[in-house]
Amino acid sequence: MSLGLSLHFKFDSNLANLSDCGVDVFNYQIYSKAIKLPLYATKVAAGFASPADDYVEKVLDLNELLIQKPAATFFVRAQGTSMLGAGIHPNDILVVDKSIEAIDGKVVIAAVNGEFTVKRLMKNSDGCWILHAENPEFPDIQLNDELELVIWGVVTNVIHQL
């Protein structure tokens, strides 16, 4: 996919390359038996609960909720604090879809000169592409023809433990 000038984003589907570079990668596996858990229709308020609302709306399978295209999905563990503003914390599990187009505003898993990162793909005010850190303590990565950039996929969900 070309984003202007001669900067091209290349998608790579070889997850072994991620693992070889010390990135924790988890392949999605389709299980023959879905685990369906109850989803209650009651909204959770930060005030007083209403006991009259205690009924199950439907059952929910987290695979169906979090994974749209199983064959194109993988998981990776976040490291560092550059994406705190996007709700991505150290050790969070990121759900990544390789089939989604990496467009302006999407959070992506990218390799820049062989180093892996998670950042927001954006055009800056000058119209140049950057990988934006969602933490002011970290600089953006200015993309140019001298950088080798490989987009591995778009982050669709974050699994975060409290």
Cite the ranges covered by each PLM segment.
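Short, positionally conserved secondary-structure boundary motifs
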Residues: 1-84, 152, 157-162
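Glycine- and charge-enriched low-complexity intrinsically disordered segments
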Residues: 39, 123-162
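Short, compositionally biased
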Residues: 104-118, 122-127
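Short coil-to-beta-strand transition motifs
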Residues: 90, 112-117, 149-150
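Hydrophobic beta-strand signal
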Residues: 95-96, 109
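Structural motif
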Residues: 91-92, 106
